[in-house]
Every structure is written in C-alpha cells, then in structure tokens.
Amino acid sequence: MDVIPAIDLLEGRCVRLYQGDYDQSQVFSENPVEVAKAWEAQGAQWLHLVDLDGAKTGQPVNLDTIAAVVEALEIPVQVGGGLRDRNRVTQLLNLGVRRGILGTVAIENPDLVQELCQEFPDQIVVGIDAREGRVATRGWLETSEILAVDLAKRMVTAGAAAIIYTDIQRDGTLQGPNIPMLREMAEAITIPVIASGGVSSITDLLNLLALEAIGVTGAIVGKALYTEDIALSEALRAVGPGRWQDVPPDLGSSALA
C-alpha cells in the first residue's frame, strides 16, 4: 500500500488545518521544497500537494512553489486545489505534475471531468471530501446533499484514475480514518481508493491495509508525520512494498464497525 506524505500550501508555507478550518492552521515549515525533499529521502514514492489558497479562490495560487517542488523531486507529484477548468489543469500538468486532483468541478461540471479524463488518461484523480458522508466543495466551505459514494460511482463512469476520499471531520485530528466509509466506497467502485484524513499511527495504516484487497491502495498522511506520531520510513516498512510484516492487522471493532 502506498503511504503518501501530504504538503498543504497556504501563502507559500507548509501548514496543516484542523477539520478543514482555515482559521485553525498550524505552520510546520516556511520551506515546502525542503520538506518535500525530506519525504523523498525517507522513501516516499509519491507526494501529495494541496494548494489551499487555490481551493479557496478557485484557481491555483502557489504555482511557483508547486513548480519548485516538482523540479526538486524525482518522485511523481499529485496536486489539488483550485483546478476547476481545462486551462488550470493543463497548466499544472505542463509543470510536470503527474496527476491533477479535481474536487469541486466534479460536482459543478462533471462533463468537464469526463473530457479531461479522456484527454489526460491516468492523470486525473477525483478528490471527494465529505462531512458525514456528504460531499463538500469550494475548499470545504460548502456542503452539498450529494452522497460521497454516489459521486464516486459517477466519477468511475467519467474515467477517473482513482478516488481520494477525505473525511473532513477527521482531517488534522489524528482520530483515525473512517474505516466503514472507506470500505463502503471501495466495495462500490472498481478503481483505486486512496484514504485521507485522520491517520495517526502505524495501527491505523495496518487497519487500512486490511482494505487493500477490496481496493484501498494508499493512504495520504499529513499531520501525523509532522507531529512525528508516524515516521515515514517505519510506515513504509510496515505497509509499503516489501513490507516486513505479514501478520494480519487488527480486525477489532474499529476496523469492522
């Protein structure tokens, strides 16, 4: 299973939000490029970048920083935040970004998502961010009545390469991922699901690993890496390619609820 470190960009700095609240941001570094290089050095196979300013304004804002990160790394980078039209997606991919993550536009213009998936096969991922199972949009500032699983099914039809599912109420909280929701989504669709939000420990990753067989192929980890609750190198040894353990993960009530 992929363990993907996350860098959230706000005003050019590396930050973490609490439950998606821009007023509860914590700065972890003034130099996102150095942070990205550190994750690569520790064995990351992907990097997840979110332009929080872009998510809020509707167009990418931290382009210079994104370009610098992509140029500094050898591993592929996926980027989300403010990608709501073809020009913005093309602009990012031309910078060398491997995958663009579409969010709000999946609700507001699903036809465009389908067109982009056809134009850029395997490079378009849909990020579904949800509160209590319902999709949030526009930088998590608005919540729709659309169910996350229903949107995921539509995006499979559109041609998305994968779904990144973020449970907003767990994001930045270190409370553990929403295992039941991830299981429901993975069982409902035929493309990979990447978990995001709440991962706080190796145990959480092992519980996600139990879902790998049904399609949960990766976990995006943010705050727990910055607080050192998780060491990336240890996480990769535990659940990544060539993992050291073949012991079944904890399948207690938290995993099977």
UniProtKB/Swiss-Prot annotation:
InterPro entries registered for this protein in UniProt: Aldolase_TIM, His_biosynth, HisA_bact_arch, Isoase_HisA-like, Isoase_HisA-like_bact, RibuloseP-bd_barrel
Alphabetical keyword list: Amino-acid biosynthesis, Cytoplasm, Histidine biosynthesis, Isomerase
SUPFAM superfamilies, sorted: Ribulose-phoshate binding barrel
Molecular function in Gene Ontology: 1-(5-phosphoribosyl)-5-[(5-phosphoribosylamino)methylideneamino]imidazole-4-carboxamide isomerase activity
Subcellular location: Cytoplasm
Active site (UniProt): 8, 129
HAMAP family: HisA
Family from the record: Belongs to the HisA/HisF family.
Pathway annotation: Amino-acid biosynthesis; L-histidine biosynthesis; L-histidine from 5-phospho-alpha-D-ribose 1-diphosphate: step 4/9
Superkingdom of this protein's organism: Bacteria
This protein's name: 1-(5-phosphoribosyl)-5-[(5-phosphoribosylamino)methylideneamino] imidazole-4-carboxamide isomerase
A Pfam family annotated for this UniProt entry: His_biosynth
